[in-house]
Every structure is written in structure tokens, then in C-alpha cells.
Amino acid sequence: MDHAIWLPYCQMKTARPPEHVVRSEGVMLHLADGRQLIDGIASWWTACHGYNHPKIVDAICQQAREMSHVMLGGLIHQPATHLADRLSRMIPGHDNRVFFCDSGSVAVEVALKMASQHWINQEIVGKNRFVCFQNSYHGDTAGAMSICDPVDSMHSHFKGFLLEQFPTTIPKSEQEFKAFKDFLLERRDQVAGVIIEPLIQMAAGLRFHSVASLKGIANLCRELGFILILDEVATGFGRTGSMFAFEQANLKPDIVCVGKGLSGGSVGLAATIATQSVYRPFHTDSWDHALMHGPTYMGNPIACAAANASLDLFEKEPRLEQVQMLEMWLSGYLEPLKAHPRVVDVRCKGAVGAVQLEEDVPLQSAIDFFVDRGCWLRPLRDVIYVAPSFTIERPQIETLCSAIREYVDTQ
């Protein structure tokens, strides 16, 4: 490759040359050679309003002229305080606290540290491990890797230095919930919290679980006194049809991790939001009780300005209604593929449509196939999926879904 970039999730020696993007607008990627691609995955599910939305661009430019960055160590600024207040009010509870960071993985790391230290600060020792779930993905930093699926994740090379956690399956039936409760009780003195991606495990191949399962897990956490951490990095900000996925189960989580769509897909930004009950043991006269974590660029003013503009758009534009329409379109175009002999399942929810095949999709040749048809799609193992910007129009959805149907028919 004729560049020095080490690309993510990529065997650099054998990978197809990356497409060179020179401009993005709406749902379109404009390439250096003049071609255009419909982006069907919104840059890993971030660009919820489409690329280069003028409201977000204006907010970024204005903030860059006033103050591009200042540390949050002993200093604060209006974009961060305004955003923190808004995020705090979006999560159930009174006086929630918002810790800013720069990626979803770090938001998860912070959540794990909050949950562990919550018990340490109360002199409750040994509660420093986490219950997580099969097929889960929470990020690529060390703590986040430790709570990903231990067998079927991308992190098998790193088992030697990862903390051992308590993975299990997401319960569905009454019998499975009884077994899950026993599982929790057996580890009660070791578990700091339970972490789950609500409703959709996105990076695991867009695997869905029910509102009933999510409610049942949350109820057991409440009953047994476990901290419930919801990883809404991928599912938050409208992706599943509600502002946050947990709203569909009417939950009151203890900690929520957000990212991706937080800034409307414009600037890297994430946050970990904790309830007052989690925060209280940190708020003492002891320095030892302070949370010792601080990303250099946490709460960057430009990123916070972008996020505030994005939240303004959610308030002023019919984004959730657009997501509901997207679900109808995706279901209409993709559900007929259930009858195809190569298709195992078709799943649609909110702004997500997934077609699961009998075997893994060869990534490089599949990307070639879709690029030749003017589409940017990037399959996940045995799943070809669409998770676009919420502003995408029906003809563009039809083009993406037609390309998927053609791929399933011909490959």
C-alpha cells in the first residue's frame, strides 16, 4: 500500500487497497477518482445526521475560532458543562454525573473503574470482576477486551494479560433466568457489576435479544445489588428506534456508556454517565476516593460543540420518526430474503438491517462487489448489514438492499 497508515481490523499485506475519500456529504462518499458511494454503515454507525450537516459544521467552526481545546483538569468550559447537563438529564435519576472521554472503548474502561472503585471506596473488598455475555463486544482496550466474548471475539491473542471475567449467555426462558440467578449468586462476592449491550450486540454480527431478557437481567441486578452497566456506545442516539435502547425496557441503569453518534459522527467523543448512587462513594473528603482517570482531550470544546449541535438536531428534526420509517423500508426490502436457501436469518430493528448467511462472507471480495455497485458496505463475518445515517432517502436504501440481494443470489 502506498501510504504509512496502519489500518484497523486489516491484514495489511493481503487487503484490497482502501478507497480514497476526498469529500463526504449527506450519505455519500466522494472518491478521488470521481466515483461516489452510498455509505450504508454511516462510518461504523456514527453519522446519524449524515455527513457534514451544516448545523454541526457551523458549531465546530465557531468553537474552533473561540477555543479549540483546554484541559478539564481544574478548568471547565461552557460547551462541556452544557453537554454534561443535557446528558445527565437524558438518563433516569437525579443529579447524574458525566465523565467525558474520546472513544467508546475508554467509556467502557471508565465504567469498569467506576463500578470497581464504588465498592473499594466503601471498604467492600473483592468485588472487582464483571459478568458479561456471549457474543459481546465492548472495545479494544484491555479492560474492554476482557469483557468481550472470550471465544468468538477478535482478542484471542491477548488472553494472557487480560483479566478473567464471568461470561455467560443472555437468558431467555424462565429456566434460563433461574440458572442465571444462581450464576450471579455463586459469584456475588466477586462481581462489581453486569455489563450488556442493550437489545443489539452490534459488532458481534448484529445479534438481537428481547426487551424481556434485558428487563429480567436488570431486575436481577437490582434484586441482588449489582451495578448495571449499559453499553449504549453503538445503540444510543436513535439507532434502535428510541433515543437509547434501554428506554424500550423502561430501565434505570446505574452506568451508561455513550459514544459514536454522540457528536453526530463528526469528532471523536464519548462519555460515561453514572447515577448519584454510583457517584456518592467517590464524593468524600478523602483523596483516595477520587476517580483517577483523565484522558488528555476529554471534553474537548470542539467535540462538545459538535455534540450539542447534534442533540439540537435530535430535538428539532424528526430523527426518531425517520428511524421508524427506515425500519419499515429495511424490513420491506430485506425480509423476503428469509426464503433464500443461503440465508439463515434476517433481522431488522430501528436503523439496522442484517442478513445472516450460512457461512462467513469473504470480506475483501464482498467489498469489491458492493463498491462496483456504488455502495459502501462492510460485512461482519457471516452478516451483511445496513446501518445508515437516519437522513438516508428511500431510493438510496433500495440501492443498498438491491446490492445485498444480488450478492446473495450470485455469490
Regions found by a protein language model. Give the residues of each.
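Conserved N-terminal phosphate-binding loop of PLP-dependent enzymes in the Aspartate aminotransferase
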Residues: 1-411
